[in-house]
Amino acid sequence: MKPVRRSGGQAVRGLLAGAVLLTAYPPNRLAAQGFPTTPPKPTRLSPARFPPFQEVTLPNGLQLVIIEHHEQPVVSVTLSFRAGGSYDPAGKEGLSALVAELLTKGTVQRTAEQLAATIEGVGGSLSASSGDDFLTVSADALSDQVDLVFDLLGDVALHATFPASELELARARALSALALELSRPASLAGRFFASEIYGRNPYGRSATRESYTAVTRDDVTAFAAQRLRPGGALLVVAGDVTVPQIQSLVEKAFTGWRGAPPPGPAPPAAPVKRATDILLVHRPGSAQSNIVLGNTTAGPTDPMYYAGRIATQALGGGADARLFLILREQRGWTYGAYASLHRYRGLGYWQATAEVRTEVTDSALSELLRQVGRLRTETIPDSELTAVKGFLVGSFPLTIETPSQIASQVANAKLLGLGDDYLRLYRERLSAVTALQAKAAAARLYRPNGLTVVVVGDAARIAARLRAIAPVRIVDVDGKPLTAADLAPPAPAGPIALDAAQFATRTDSSNVLLQGKAIGYTVSDVRRSGDSLLYVERSSLGTGAFEQRTTVLLDPADGSVRQVDQVTAQQSQRAETHLTYAGGRVKGQSAAPQPDGSVKRYDIDTVLPVGTLDENAVPFVVPALPLGPGRSFTLSCFTPSENSQKTLTFKVGGLESVTVPAGTFQAYRIAVTGSRVPFTMYVSTETPRRVLKTEFVGQPFVVELVK
């Protein structure tokens, strides 16, 4: 976190206020008033007031828990099924998440819009989500709308229709979110870490582009029919309601609901490691390294949990824990380092994480390992133990203040089989943990000779130093094993033979979409102009708020750029770029509007590698590359708006059917990295090839071909 900067006026006023205070109350006078010099001792633990609840298992196997909580006129309902991601079939990871999203997207009686309008019209909410173990439908509203809540809950649980059109929208959103996730090193580290510690166990699997694409509507309906059954499900109702009232509503909403899900197959055991090693995920050019280390632990009811919770909180539970204080405050290596202990219905895990500067990756990892070792071999000092327990015990009441929080806590305890007294005795059990018990828990939970360590970063810069800590395996971001020879930065391949048949005269029109809504357009023309090819692109966004015309002159023989002229108008700003490419140099002037209202200008005279492409020509040149599934191209590109040269990598995936306003086409999916924002291009297979769609990773913008 950066320090808050105060203006000069604010600073002066602050100094004056301090001077006045010291004048009125000099230090000796303040001391004389008897202000304490040490914090007070903690008071005796007062019992948390957790409302009683009533529980019954209905004839259809549905477990119903009702908590009367009359302090606020609201009601919160959760309906949970054993249908989380761990139940996804192999090769169709993400199925449970798609089912959850589609549950509220239409029923026999209501469309998605009608469902949303009905619950939002009374100020409530209705949603569904999928975790690793459970799929949960949640609803919240004012308590005088509880009849409506159960009407909607029963409707989506029993009568969801899973429209095919909604499935495609959900799939598109999931793929966009996945692309963003894969662009983030912290997310990559988490995915690889789960795979390493769980192996073939379902907890170790993650959704992929291929698995999302493989899911059909039949898969969705079959999964829902098999797993969203009342037998073994849990319905928790908390709020300003009565037991008879809820029993009546449940009977009405779920009339005729029968059945139980089939037992799932026994999951494969997680691998048992005999030695610590490092999985290094190569992310070329990364300025930071993301470190995750840890191992699997125990089941949710293991009595060692409370002592392990104390030890893990001391290690890295917050800004006052050891990892944060040492790696950030003392060393200045990171903005934060943390540790956490996780429970699943099956085997849980613990982890420690840090994002550090590349040059201190090995030092930070060594310090992480050292601090883990200290918790295993040293008892926590009394003052630290008191502070840790004080935080965990004192903050617990904040998690059971509202009906929504109460419902969530009760559901979690019931689903994990933690016992009816878990919430009532949680604070007392934490308070009873001794320093020796915390040390014993750490010694058992943190396995020093079997830790999994995942580092995502620039392997070319850090691999050698990490080998001094533990054996290192290197993979790329797709998990493909790499050797030392693979770590050399990709060199531009120079000129690549382009397919001249793709240079046919044509005009393409595309829409620019923001979160699915058109906000502008782009029109591109390709035609002959004397002995050159002329590529002209015109773009307009926000009803004229942004206008740009780019003209690129190219050599028809090899597609090399000869000249670029660009005029950009952004509200009151106007910027022009005029460049010539010849003899391995680019010369001219470039200008680009900036967010602060200024225009950044460059005088350019730069020597470029052979075959360098102007970035404005990428949409024209890429369709003419010798495309094929599995092929990869590395091109040197010059970016006029930044006066910089970059190396872009174009990886061609498999063929996909892509539907855009212009029609449905077979297309190459091309992942482009190396630019400021990674993006994906979909290029038709028919000659002349056309760019059908462009998606920008982590951005809500999409460009789609219209005609």
Give the residues covered by each predicted segment.
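Bacterial N-terminal signal peptides
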Residues: 13-25
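M16 family metallopeptidases and their MPP-like homologs
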Residues: 65-67, 71-101, 110-158, 171-179, ...
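Sec/Tat signal peptide C-region and signal peptidase I cleavage site
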Residues: 28-32
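Intrinsic disorder
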Residues: 7, 25-27
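Acidic, serine/threonine-rich low-complexity disordered tracts
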Residues: 492-583, 626-707
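An aromatic/glycine/proline-enriched structural segment found at the starts
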Residues: 33-41, 203, 234-299, 457-491
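N-terminal secretory signal peptides that target proteins for export/translocation
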Residues: 1-9
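Mature N-terminal segment immediately following signal peptide/propeptide cleavage
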Residues: 42, 46-80
